């Protein structure tokens, strides 16, 4: 039997508004199957006008599938959807728009060479010539009403990530949406941009809009939402008022058991230089600088966080170190662990010769004995092969080392099964193609494989993106284990709260330059956020201008 509970508010929003909130959407017994997999199992859920509802759940719990049925991407196998008290049939996004429902996806769907106004009206039907000036005026009116800051005539390729997200939200508002669904809306925003977005969402709530947010960030749930609905393994667990709960209770509802929400930052026994980057400069295929004179050191026995607005050079930095991107200038020196570095009180000599990695391919880097692991941002494009099963994906880094015409699959099969057990990967078996796994489970496969290669340098980009709370904390634990083994961990992250708790130091990139390197124990989220939007001279912590 499903556990369902709804707690009454303590001085809730209905009382503050002086009226009883009206139901915007009601889901009754919604079920969706994909083959033998039941993604949603008889879900009942209500979304009210004039509220912000957060939707929580572990990976594979059915959150996105459920919202995709409301927005017309999927059609339910069983159950009913009621909008404004009337049962409706939603077979396409066009049907959803006609009912005032719009979904803003995490990955933007914009045309770079078009302006904001052109993207907003793109796809709308009309008779005769389209009045783009009138559309721009309407966009400006909506922006001023809710507090958006956007230039309707600005090209998308000149926009920041937050401006692009603004255009996506304006697209659904322009089409008359009263019910908005946002999937991980703060994933790539700075703290300051997040606060601006929250202010806009609160304005829309005050205007009577119904807003659903899919997120894994519990502190944002507590700060923004009125109620929280929780799914677990495709089933509806319950809805609680935010004022009556806390992150620990929400986590227990999601996972089904108590989970510690403390992120450890243990002190390693020793710390020695592992990477030294000097004046690293890279350009993209169009000749634009993606990295500009980047210099820093990374040490074994530490986690070095790398923060920055999306597109600030994080991806290019890791790829240049891994030999996947050519460098125009600069060097990357690798220093192997010193044989005596784990002896208490031993100081590793500073005059060691490093191995130059610039100019080497990933295969050449492996052949000179550099044990470097890389978890890329693009999981299925660069990290794994979607059509292969887990066993074959385990072999991608080592199959060239086998001699003879046949490849031994016993060891990679055992590794795949061990990762399933240790990381709680949800899959029918090791022979299932990874493209059939949820995004979070794909990430576990990739991170698990790289960590198992016993690296001395582990570079990972957004390792918990799309992961639920339980899985995220598992990954944090794995990164700390590597740190305590003397591995130099380079972690590109987007959640500053996590970086501040987990990392020993944080390197901040802005426009391809190092704008600051700060101590994770002595800085604040606001300070890091300012470095993300401002080049501050590349000062070390304690040496700021």
Task: Describe the role of every protein-language-model region.
Residues 19-545:
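Glycine-rich phosphate-binding loops of nucleotide-dependent enzymes
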């Amino acid at each position: 039997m499903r556990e369902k509970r709804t707690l009454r508010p303590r001085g809730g929003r209905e009382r503050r508004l002086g009226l009883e909130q009206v139901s915007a959407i009601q889901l009754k017994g919604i079920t969706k199957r994909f083959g033998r997999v039941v993604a949603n199992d008889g879900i009942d859920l209500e979304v009210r006008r004039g509220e912000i509802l957060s939707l929580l759940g572990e990976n594979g719990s059915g959150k996105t599938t459920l919202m995709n049925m409301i927005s017309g991407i999927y059609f339910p196998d069983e159950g009913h959807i009621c909008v404004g008290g009337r049962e409706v049939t939603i077979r396409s996004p066009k049907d959803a728009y006609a009912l005032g429902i719009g979904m803003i996806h995490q990955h933007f769907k914009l045309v770079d060479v078009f302006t904001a106004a052109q993207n907003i009206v793109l796809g709308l039907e009309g008779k005769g010539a389209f009045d783009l000036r009138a559309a721009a005026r309407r966009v400006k009116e909506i922006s001023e009403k809710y507090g958006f800051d956007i230039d309707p005539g600005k090209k998308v390729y000149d926009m920041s990530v937050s401006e692009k997200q603004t255009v996506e939200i304006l697209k659904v508002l322009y089409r008359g949406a009263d019910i908005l669904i946002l999937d991980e809306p703060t994933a790539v925003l700075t703290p300051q941009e997040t606060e601006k977005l929250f202010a806009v969402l609160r304005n829309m709530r005050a205007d009577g809009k119904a807003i659903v947010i899919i997120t894994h960030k519990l502190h944002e749930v507590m700060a923004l939402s009125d109620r929280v609905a929780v799914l677990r393994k495709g089933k509806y667990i319950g809805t609680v008022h935010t004022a009556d709960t806390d992150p620990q209770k929400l986590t227990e509802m999601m996972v089904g058991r108590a989970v510690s929400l403390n992120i450890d930052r243990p002190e390693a026994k020793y710390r020695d230089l592992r990477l030294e980057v000097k004046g690293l400069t890279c350009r993209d295929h169009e000749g634009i600088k993606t990295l500009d004179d980047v210099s820093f050191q990374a040490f074994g026995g530490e986690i070095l966080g790398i923060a920055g607005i999306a597109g600030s050079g994080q991806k290019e930095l890791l790829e240049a170190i891994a030999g996947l991107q050519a460098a125009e200038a600069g060097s990357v020196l690798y220093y192997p662990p010193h044989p005596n570095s784990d002896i208490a009180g031993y100081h590793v000599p500073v005059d060691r010769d490093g191995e130059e990695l610039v100019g080497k391919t990933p295969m050449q880097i492996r052949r000179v004995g550099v044990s470097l692991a890389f978890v890329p941002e693009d999981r299925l494009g660069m990290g794994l092969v979607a059509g292969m099963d887990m066993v074959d994906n385990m072999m991608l880094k080592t199959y060239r080392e086998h001699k003879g015409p046949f490849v031994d699959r016993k060891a990679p099969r055992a590794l795949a099964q061990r990762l399933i057990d240790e990381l709680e990967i949800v899959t029918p078996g090791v022979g299932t193609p990874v493209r059939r796994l949820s995004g979070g489970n794909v990430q576990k496969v990739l991170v698990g494989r790289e960590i198992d290669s016993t690296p001395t340098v582990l570079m990972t980009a957004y390792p918990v993106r799309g992961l639920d709370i339980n899985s995220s904390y598992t990954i944090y634990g794995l990164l700390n284990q590597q740190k305590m083994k003397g591995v130099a961990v380079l972690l590109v992250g987007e959640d500053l709260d996590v970086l501040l708790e987990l990392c020993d130091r944080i390197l901040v990139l802005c426009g391809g330059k190092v704008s600051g390197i700060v101590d994770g124990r002595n800085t604040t989220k606001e300070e890091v956020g300012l470095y993300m939007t401002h080049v501050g001279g590349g000062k070390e912590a304690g040496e700021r201008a």
